[in-house]
Amino acid sequence: TRCRSPSPAARTTCAAMSRQDAELIKQMNMNAVRSHYPPDEHFLDMCDSLGLVYLDELAGWQNCYDSQVGARLAGEMVRRDVNHPSIIIWCNGNEGGWNYSTDSLFAKHDHLQKRHVIHPWADFDDLDTHHYPAYLTGVARFTNGYKVFMPTEFMHAMYDQGGGAGLRDFWDRWLTNPLFAGGFVWVFCDEAPKRTDKNNVLDSDKSNAPDGVVGPRREKEGSFYAIREQWSPIQLKPFFITDHFDGSFKVTNEYTYTSLSACTMTYRVLSLGTPMQNGGQASEIAKGAVALPDIAPGETGTARFTLPENFREGDVLVLEAFDKEGKSICTWSRTISFARQYFDRKMAQTPATLELAEKATASNTDGTVTLKSGKVSVDFDANTGMIKTVRSAGTEIPFNNGPVAVGMKMRCEPSLSYVQNTPEGAVFCAKYKGAADSIVWRLTDRGLLYMDAVLLNRASGGGGFDDAFMDTKVYNLGLTFSYPETACKGMKWMGRGPYRVWKNRIAGTNYNIWHKDYNNTITGESYDNLIYPEFKGYHANMYWATIESDTAPFTVYSRCDGIFYRIFTPQEPEGRARGRRTMPAFPEGDISFLLDIPAIQSFKPIEQQGPNSQPGNIRIKSGDEGLRINLMFDFRK
């Protein structure tokens, strides 16, 4: 849904802005637009020209025009717009704002085509347009009904909610019914005009208008790219790249009319270094064309390319599809090796950066376990297993107060823990009861600190807990630490990016090496300094991440797959309605390594969203090997 929203400093629109908006809408792979009132004629011209269909609406919201005024306005609107081929439906009011006596007037003035008239949000005249349905909405309607259905508003995108978050669940469910005709995301952009009477602030009227997938200056939020991927007319079937990958994968044609033979696809192979290797730089080592199958809309076939000789030397495969006009449709990426393989291979390629320091040693004195190698030392509380102090070259790195369990309970057992000096390094093995079995810390002679955590491998938790040692509904699960936000200048990382993710909005992110300067952007509110992507939040599939700091930089590497890297806690909007939380609760601490994260809602509570928005659950059976969080920290300077 797009309302007439000029740039913040303006009070009118223009053809150039209409073209910009239409092109942004098409970039999201959308093909239809609705507004709450007749749009500018130049926007309809853009829809006609660029290929967007339009639902033209007589204004009215909850209350309607009386019969005399409604008849005059309906006639003026239809007579003005009737010859625009982009218009496929007339809308009479919105959410109760219709006058039934006006319905027949649309056909009177549209006497050649007599396009269908709908009442947006109502089940009216064989078209069910129910607004903001829950995932299971459908007692004798929607997927369980016998009428064409098309929600004319859904996925409410207030602040960072909705939009592309949870979209896949709804869309896939509705596609199971051939009577599904489409849907309209609310809304295109934040509406925040510049208020010259309020020191030129951009004013979205608190929580009433920061509902956009793009900002007031058309800044792209994370949902922009999530929608673009989920509504791409070319869809990739899920696949991993393993040793058996031969360059072929399944694609589905979700166009309405176009054969896939009219489109093209390319591949690129990226080599992604680590901070220890080349400062964490990306390079392209191969590229070429992908052969797409000649398949009609609705069909699935096999795309393939010939693997270049150096394919296995790469780290990420990037695929990009283009439409028949050569415009990019979507970009996808897959890692060529799993995290542990990537880590081992890169470590083997970086001996020059890993000169030996003095022999690593472990000691336990007065309740403090110390691991030391050269200029790096780490102190642990022997009773809790938590890091107390990290020092590098005489400077304290304020990474501490962890690991703290998230979404579960664990209790360190000092009597079972031990300190050991081994040929592989200085070891502190912290043993636990509850959700954690053990966390082994090992500082090598090169000053690198390894952490190997074994979680959820014992149904009894080793005993000692009278109640459950994990959350019944798992929103966050993993380990968390403290690190002062004031010390951080930025972040460089390899993983999915550049946008933060939610459990139900990972789509739209891709594997690469990314960088962000620190920012405190509040989505949909920080209009004075609206920097996207937001810095704080969850980042998916971390391979490594460097915290940039003038005083306390460090890098952490993941040696297991599927780690969500949480960096700090996003600030809640000040203008949120009645002080209600707009985001799910974050773990305590500042930096977390998680195996599960929460979804974000869209207008209705999480319980009414789809299955991929729901919290996880844990079951442990005898013989389970458990879950792993295996990391390596480089605190060296």
Residue map of PLM features:
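Terminal connector regions
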Residues: 308-348
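Beta-strand/loop-rich accessory regions of lumenal/periplasmic or secreted enzymes
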Residues: 310-312, 343-637
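Substrate-binding clefts and catalytic carboxylate motifs of secreted carbohydrate-active enzymes
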Residues: 90, 140-305, 311, 553-556, ...
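Substrate-binding/catalytic cleft of secreted carbohydrate-active enzymes
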Residues: 16-25, 31-222, 240
